[in-house]
């Protein structure tokens, strides 16, 4: 269905895969930009993220298995996976916290560009993924508790994960 849609709509495609996080985060809202060889984030997409009150962007270092990776690599869409804050129990979510993404999407649907970034959402902090964690099987051990926030800095020597054959330990600089 996605391929048919892309073929029927040859103009620019945009895909924003919106999520709320289960894990806490030191950066409440962030986006992941799927890796596509030679591609950079267009200025209008950076402006869109800031209008949506997303101030943190992670650049993935290789193709992934997410829906946004599929749509960017195979359908040539400008795609992001966007984490919009921590989910609360049903009925306890403050919908006002989603006004940024709501306004940005409404403007996009009308075909209007994002306004020039304004404080406090006028700077996008960009990180590059350097290592990904993949569950390698039955003897995989992940050493980060579920209640540790995303974007926590780990000191050199910290073991992040291991299995019977290998492990990932933070190198000489904090990560």
Regions found by a protein language model. Give the residues of each.
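Structured catalytic-domain cores with a bias toward divalent-metal coordination
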Residues: 1-175
């Amino acid at each position: 269905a996605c391929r048919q849609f892309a073929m029927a709509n040859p103009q620019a495609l945009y895909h924003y895969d919106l999520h709320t996080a289960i894990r806490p985060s030191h950066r409440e809202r962030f986006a992941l930009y799927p890796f596509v060889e030679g591609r950079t984030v267009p200025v209008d997409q950076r402006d869109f993220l800031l209008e949506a009150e997303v101030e943190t962007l992670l650049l993935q270092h290789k193709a992934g298995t997410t829906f946004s990776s599929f749509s960017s690599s195979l359908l040539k869409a400008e795609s992001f996976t966007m984490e919009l804050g921590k989910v609360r129990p049903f009925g306890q979510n403050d919908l006002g916290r989603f006004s940024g993404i709501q306004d940005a999407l409404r403007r996009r649907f009308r075909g209007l560009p994002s306004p020039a970034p304004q404080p406090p959402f006028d700077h996008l902090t960009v990180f590059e993924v350097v290592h990904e964690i993949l569950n390698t099987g039955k003897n995989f051990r992940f050493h980060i508790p579920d209640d540790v926030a995303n974007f926590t800095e780990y000191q050199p020597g910290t073991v992040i994960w291991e299995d019977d054959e290998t492990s990932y330990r933070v190198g000489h600089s904090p990560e």
